UniProtKB/Swiss-Prot annotation:
Gene3D superfamilies: 3.30.70.260. The lineage of its organism: Bacteria, Pseudomonadati, Pseudomonadota, Gammaproteobacteria, Enterobacterales. One of its GO terms (cellular component) is cytosol. It comes from Edwardsiella ictaluri (strain 93-146). It comes from the Bacteria. This is UPF0250 protein NT01EI_2946. Belongs to the UPF0250 family.
Length: 87
């Protein structure tokens, strides 16, 4: 994945992902599980429901150590079946 993030970020840094997915109970657990694989830590993600309640957004902040970690997490979070978008 070619991005300009590497030019914009100085590592290590805090990096927040916003993951939008179907409003299912396992969404938060699946997001945390993927993040734990690449950035082990103690996470308390923030969850906000959509206005109709069909979707949830999960915000989670990691301590990123290199650009490959950031890009890998974008890819793997997007591969979760019930995830619709990762920002």
């Amino acid at each position: 994945m070619k991005t300009k993030l590497n030019e914009l970020l100085e590592f290590p840094c805090e990096f927040t992902y916003k993951v939008m997915g179907l409003a299912q109970p396992e969404l938060v657990d699946q997001v945390v599980e993927v993040v734990q694989r690449h950035a082990p830590g103690d996470y308390t993600p923030q969850v906000k429901p959509s206005s109709k309640g069909n979707y949830h957004s999960v915000s989670i902040t990691i301590n990123a150590t290199h650009i490959e970690q950031v890009e890998t997490l974008y890819e793997e979070l997007g591969n979760i079946e019930i995830v619709r978008m990762v920002l």
